[in-house]
């Protein structure tokens, strides 16, 4: 279906801002526990095949995360395009309280990628536990026992330049 604007142009012919070409969404409710500073694959993945090599792909992620520590710890999150890391944050969810408590969050980040291809791309999230200290540390995706409806969502949107 083509949407036409008041001036007679359509989504595909109007000049100006980027246009949305396609959207692909995936989600995961699989619980992941990260125990080391080595990044581990998750099933939080989405596949998209760009229609033009000049188009960009906007990745949007909503994550259900938790950190527990008797001292301090953090959850590291990394975004891959295929096997290449294109974004990471070793302190995405940081627990710095010197007390044995759980800190749970639903959080969001975006990354605008320029993949320069028309082949299928797999975007994937990895996780790791960072800021290792004395005592007990735990870092999780999808570990929110009081609300089982939480999960991680990843969205890939192809956009014209």
Question: What is each residue range found by the language model?
Answer:
Residues 44-48:
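Extended, low-complexity regulatory regions
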Residues 1-31:
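Glycine-rich, low-complexity segments
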């Amino acid at each position: 279906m083509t949407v036409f604007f008041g001036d007679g142009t359509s989504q595909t012919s109007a000049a100006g801002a980027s246009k949305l070409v396609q959207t692909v969404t995936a989600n995961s409710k699989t619980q992941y526990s990260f125990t080391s500073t080595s990044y581990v694959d998750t099933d939080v993945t989405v596949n998209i095949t760009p229609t033009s090599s000049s188009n960009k792909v906007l990745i949007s992620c909503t994550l259900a995360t938790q950190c527990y520590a008797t001292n301090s710890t953090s959850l590291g999150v990394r975004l891959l395009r295929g096997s290449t890391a294109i974004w990471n944050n070793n302190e995405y969810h940081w627990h710095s309280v010197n007390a044995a408590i759980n800190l749970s969050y639903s959080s969001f980040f975006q990354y605008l990628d320029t993949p320069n291809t028309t082949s299928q791309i797999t975007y994937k999230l990895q996780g790791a536990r960072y800021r290792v200290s004395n005592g007990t540390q735990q870092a999780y995706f999808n570990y929110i026992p009081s609300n089982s409806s939480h999960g991680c969502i990843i969205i890939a949107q192809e956009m014209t330049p």
